[in-house]
């Protein structure tokens, strides 16, 4: 193992009273909550792209971060060093999983053949490092949006040859994900959308991406991949409008192409913000539609119209999110992947640890608070009582299709229904009592 982060041996749990900045205050991996350990509930992962690939650049300035592997003249040698340092970080942080795009781990090269050679070389290395460290792959994916060839989309591109190139990348990334024991495969349509309707055929592009997803499902079954396929919703950026706008939009797409039993969603907090939703809303919607798959844990800034990908730091927001997950039975193959990056001014390499440690503690404390809410059943009792009438004779007849509009119009003549309080203020006080105890 490399010793790039030589000031740290391993991040450990020291409890809430610890003042050690390189220790967990709330994340105790083996602590049992609602019958499962914290590690089993959260299934934490570090993302390769923001953590090991980003150099600190933005739209207004070049990279600000000093990363040795980004200075090497040989791209493949740089990728090998990056893998060494990545697994040092993962091991010292003590997380069980990581995630990657194909071109995060290996250089794309100057041809498809070179891309395949480079990718397979690094997959060999990752397979060995996983075996040595015990760190596993939560999910893999293909980057079909950064290369200029994808400026007009990948699956939705007007050129079928570019569609074909994207399919080839997904083919390789899916095969690698299976080989590495990945538990999910993610599809994020970074440029599957439009800049202007003036040059866009919406029906055609929808049919193209629908067929693309059907081919992905076909390949999953052909190679015997037992993991979960996930689409990651996002409303815009980099395109003006993206076709996977939010969870509800994705569900409508899946239904149209007969994929609702094959694909679930990977929900990112910042993408919910961009779509004008709360993180809790997107999770609750996915759970209600039976497509909740995995989580990209981060936060956005409601005052900014772009993806800031900051580390999550709100116990309130994440308690409500995890409460919805626990009510839905928890995550199965999914987990909490930190799709988050340090700030451009955070130039100390150890800032990577501070960002992840703080975020992990936020999720751990949020899990404790949400679990208590589930355990006490107080909130659920209020909801159950609110809808209790639907368990009665009238409600059951309506839901069972045994009543018509005409029959209900007749029944209404003998009714004098009265509304009851929604108790929102009381419920919000209850929730605050759990969060800030």
UniProtKB/Swiss-Prot annotation:
Binding residue positions for Mg(2+) 2: 268, 271, 307, 309
Protein localization: Cytoplasm
Enzyme class: isomerase
Main localization (coarse): cytoplasm
GO cellular component: cytoplasm
Binding site for Mg(2+) 1: 232, 268, 296, 339
Keywords, sorted A to Z: Carbohydrate metabolism, Cytoplasm, Isomerase, Magnesium, Metal-binding, Xylose metabolism
Lineage: superkingdom: Bacteria
Entry note: cofactor: Binds 2 magnesium ions per subunit.
EC nos: 5.3.1.5
Cofactor: Mg(2+)
Catalytic activity: alpha-D-xylose = alpha-D-xylulofuranose
Active site (UniProt): 101, 104
Record PANTHER family: PTHR48408, XYLOSE ISOMERASE (PTHR48408:SF1)
Family the UniProt entry places it in: Belongs to the xylose isomerase family.
The name this protein goes by in its record: Xylose isomerase
Upper taxonomic lineage: Bacteria, Pseudomonadati, Pseudomonadota, Gammaproteobacteria, Pasteurellales
């Amino acid at each position: 193992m490399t010793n790039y982060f030589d000031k740290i041996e391993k991040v450990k749990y020291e409890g809430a009273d610890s003042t050690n900045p390189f220790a967990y205050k709330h994340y105790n991996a083996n602590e049992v909550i609602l019958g499962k350990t914290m590690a089993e509930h959260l299934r934490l992962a570090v993302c390769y792209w923001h953590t090991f690939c980003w150099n600190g650049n933005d739209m207004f300035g070049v990279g600000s971060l000093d990363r040795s592997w980004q200075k090497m003249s040989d791209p493949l040698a740089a990728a090998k060093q990056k893998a060494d340092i990545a697994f040092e970080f993962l091991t010292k942080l003590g997380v069980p999983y990581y995630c990657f795009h194909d071109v995060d781990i290996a250089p794309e090269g100057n041809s498809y053949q070179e891309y395949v050679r480079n990718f397979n070389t690094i997959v060999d290395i990752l397979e060995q490092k996983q075996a040595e460290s015990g760190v596993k792959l939560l999910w893999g994916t293909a980057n079909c949006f950064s290369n200029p060839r994808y400026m007009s989309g990948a699956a939705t591109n007007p050129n079928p040859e570019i569609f074909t190139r994207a399919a080839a990348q997904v083919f390789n990334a899916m095969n690698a994900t299976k080989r590495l024991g990945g538990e999910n495969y993610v599809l994020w349509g970074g440029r599957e959308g439009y800049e202007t309707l003036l040059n866009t055929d919406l029906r055609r592009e929808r049919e193209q991406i629908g067929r693309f997803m059907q081919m992905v499902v076909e390949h999953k079954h052909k190679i015997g991949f037992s993991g979960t396929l996930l689409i990651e919703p996002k409303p815009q950026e980099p395109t003006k409008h993206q076709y996977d706008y939010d969870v509800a939009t994705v569900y409508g797409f899946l239904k149209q192409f007969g994929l609702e039993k094959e694909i679930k969603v990977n929900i990112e907090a910042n993408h919910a913000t961009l779509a004008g939703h709360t993180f809790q809303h997107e999770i609750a919607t996915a759970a209600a539609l039976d497509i909740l798959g995995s989580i990209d844990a981060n936060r956005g800034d409601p005052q900014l119209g772009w993806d800031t990908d900051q580390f999550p730091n709100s116990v309130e927001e994440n308690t409500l999110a995890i409460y919805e997950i626990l009510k839905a039975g928890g995550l199965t193959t999914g987990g909490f992947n930190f799709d988050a990056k340090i700030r451009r001014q955070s130039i100390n390499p150890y800032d990577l640890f501070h960002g992840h440690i703080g975020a992990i503690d936020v999720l751990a404390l949020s899990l404790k608070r949400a679990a208590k809410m589930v355990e006490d059943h107080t909130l659920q009792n209020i909801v159950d009582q609110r809808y209790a009438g639907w368990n009665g004779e009238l409600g059951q007849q309506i839901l069972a299709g045994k009543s018509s509009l005409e029959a209900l119009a007749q029944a209404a003549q003998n009714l004098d229904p009265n509304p009851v309080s929604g108790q929102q203020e009381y419920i919000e006080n209850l929730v605050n009592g759990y969060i800030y105890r």
